[in-house]
Regions:
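Cross-family detector of peptidyl-prolyl cis-trans isomerase
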Residues: 1-112
Length: 112
């Protein structure tokens, strides 16, 4: 319960509400995350205690859309259908074509 489904197929569940800024399309963000396949297999995660920093415009569509709904300090579980993730091409050896992906994302900081 508590799962929100958007028109584009993105699903999210708020694990912790944030109180800070909401990122816009050109912003840089710092996040902690864990990426899983639908069967629970972890395929990627941010370095412990540091997170990763990136420009919003440089990541997959589902991440851009989810992060622009989150506030700094928020911690969400996000489910991305293939069209919002890596689609038909997949990514590397770990993410096959047309895979639904599950991410836990904590938005640490937003920088303009």
């Amino acid at each position: 319960s508590g799962v929100v489904t958007l028109e584009n197929g993105l699903l999210y569940r708020v694990l912790k509400k944030g109180k800070g800024k909401i990122p816009a399309g050109n912003d840089t963000v710092q996040v902690h995350y864990t990426g899983r396949l639908i069967d629970g297999t972890i395929f990627d995660r941010s370095p412990q205690g540091v997170g990763i920093t990136f420009k919003l415009r440089g990541v997959i569509r589902g991440w851009r859309e989810a992060l622009q709904l989150m506030r700094e300090g928020a911690h969400w579980e996000v489910v991305l259908p293939p069209g919002l993730a890596y689609g038909r091409r997949g990514s590397g050896e770990k993410i096959g074509p047309n895979q639904t992906l599950v991410f836990e994302i904590e938005l640490i900081e937003v920088r303009n």
